[in-house]
């Protein structure tokens, strides 16, 4: 890919799991964070240092099973997901419908 980019999660809305696809223009240390509607971080997913490429398919995209870092199932509502890859940061919205 020519640019690093955070793509729309799928499915959206979802219940209880979703995948968060992204593209990396260069090798980067990647972290994904999930926030609730109030802006509180509820989950962090550290992917470590990964090579440039497309992480779009189910077996490559970031997986989130709808649980907090403490393992609690989250309730229906709007959440935000953010990816940090080197100097790149992007945030998008997703919805859980139960």
Regions inferred by a protein language model and the residue ranges of each:
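Residue-level signal for short segments within beta-strands and strand-turn junctions
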Residues: 34-38, 68, 85, 96-98
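Short beta-strand edge segments in extracellular beta-sheet folds
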Residues: 48-49, 94-98
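Conserved beta-strand and immediately adjacent loop positions that scaffold enzyme active sites
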Residues: 31, 63, 93
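Extracellular and select intracellular beta-sandwich modules with Ser/Thr-enriched
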Residues: 88-92
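N-terminal processing/targeting junctions
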Residues: 28, 86-87
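Glycine-centered coil/turn sites that cap beta-strands in beta-rich domains
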Residues: 1-10, 14-38, 44-48
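Short, surface-exposed loop/turn motifs with a glycine/proline- and acidic-biased composition
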Residues: 46-86
């Amino acid at each position: 890919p020519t640019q690093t980019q955070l793509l729309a999660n799928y499915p959206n809305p979802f219940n209880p799991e979703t995948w968060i696809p992204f593209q990396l223009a260069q090798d980067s240390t990647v972290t994904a964070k999930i926030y609730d509607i109030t802006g509180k971080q509820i989950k962090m997913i550290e992917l470590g240092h990964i090579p440039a490429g497309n992480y779009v398919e189910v077996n490559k995209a970031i997986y989130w099973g709808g649980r907090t870092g403490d393992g609690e199932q989250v309730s229906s509502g709007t959440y935000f997901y953010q990816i940090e890859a080197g100097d790149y940061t992007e945030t998008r919205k997703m919805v859980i419908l139960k």
